[in-house]
C-alpha cells in the first residue's frame, strides 16, 4: 500500500518522539491534520480564515459528491483529501461532467496516495496562486516573511515564483499576511511553513492549504 507524504511524515515524527529525538518541525498531530485537506479546511473555517465554498466533510462516492456539488454550484473542482503536487484533481464545469471527473480524480488519488478520500470546492476561474512564508515558534509567536506569486503553472505544477507579487497592493499584502499568521496559529503550527492562497481579480482571497 502506498503512503501519502503526510502519513510518512507523521510516522517519522512519531518515531522521533518515541526515541526522545528533537524533531525540527511541527508535531505529528499538526502534520496529520494539515495533511488532510478536508480537516485543514475545517480548521480554517473555525478560525475565521476565508476559504473557498466547498464540502464540509470528506466525500467518498459519486452520489454524495453530486448532491454536494449541486449545493456549492458549478464549476466544481474535485480534490484528493491527502493529495499534493497537483495529483488527484479534476474540474467539472457542469453536472454532466461530474461523474467522470470524480472517478478519474479518485482513481488517481488512490494510485498516488493510497487513499481515495475526496473533497469538493467551487472552482475559481483564473486566480493568482500566492504563497506566504511563515515562521512560528512553540510559544505561539508567528510572523510572515512576505509572499511569492506562483501563478505561472503547468498541470498544477509551479514553474516560476515571483517575489514580491505585482498583484498585491500594500493594503492587500497586509490583509493577506495577517490571514496567513491567523491560519498558522489556528493550526498550532511550529517551524517554517507555507500558506497557499488563491487570489481573485476582485481582491477576494481564500486559504487553500498549508505545508
Predicted regions and their residues:
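Internal nucleotide-binding/catalytic subdomain
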Residues: 59, 70-82, 89-211
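A glycine- and small-aliphatic-rich helix-loop capping segment at beta-alpha/alpha-beta transitions
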Residues: 12-23, 94-99
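A conserved helix-loop-beta module that forms one wall/lid of the active-site cleft
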Residues: 17-81, 88
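Single conserved hydrophobic/aromatic residue that forms the stacking wall/gate
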Residues: 1-7, 11
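Hydrophobic (often cysteine-bearing) scaffold residues that line and stabilize catalytic clefts
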Residues: 3, 36, 40, 172, ...
